[in-house]
């Protein structure tokens, strides 16, 4: 019982902490983070213009697709909001447990269903969703466009051709230059969003494990709920009936002892 209470306290603490982190990370500039091309200090996208390579006509990546940046930003924000909602839900369920007797509309079977199915399933689902949204978003956040010197020969800002650019959409020369300038400016600024995101992800994993351990002791069979409730209320009497009851019938002679075994009634 003490371990269960400690687990509940730890889950409540983690839930509050993750709710606070979720609120602070919702408004992070995810588009700027992706434009910086850095992940945990490692440069994953090279958006710096090398004029020597440019003049020689060598292909080099210059483009992050803003469509996927927007999708990724929304995906992460939705993941954070969903994570916060699940944490609040699990927190409410845990806090209601001691006061369950005051809620007449919540029966034991309903509460067992909420604990067993809802909390355990959603705690695992949120971690999977968060990992997928972050991983897929990171994979799709950037599409490289190979640009040659001839692609910039036109000064009217015309779109690039399919032969020189391999991306989901076409874009103009000024658009590329604007992206390069903005990415260079953003790269010089420290970005803490990824660190907060990673911390939130690990806390999600810890919380999911703790919730799974906490509610793993509950039997999934709802049909024996009444029988287990009876055993809980009659624990003191059931301890005496461990398997068989022995009645000793003794006579005046010490070696004349009769024993009778009575099978317990279930």
Swiss-Prot record:
Keyword Transmembrane recorded: yes
Membrane topology, from the record: Multi-pass membrane protein
Keywords for the protein's UniProt record, in alphabetical order: Membrane, Transmembrane, Transmembrane helix
Compartments where located: Membrane
Bilayer-spanning residue ranges: 9-29, 79-99, 122-142, 193-213
GO cellular component: membrane
Entry keyword annotation includes Endoplasmic reticulum: no
The organism's place on the tree of life at top rank: Eukaryota
Coiled-coil ranges from the UniProt annotation: none
Protein name per UniProt: Putative uncharacterized transmembrane protein DDB_G0290203
Protein's organism: Dictyostelium discoideum
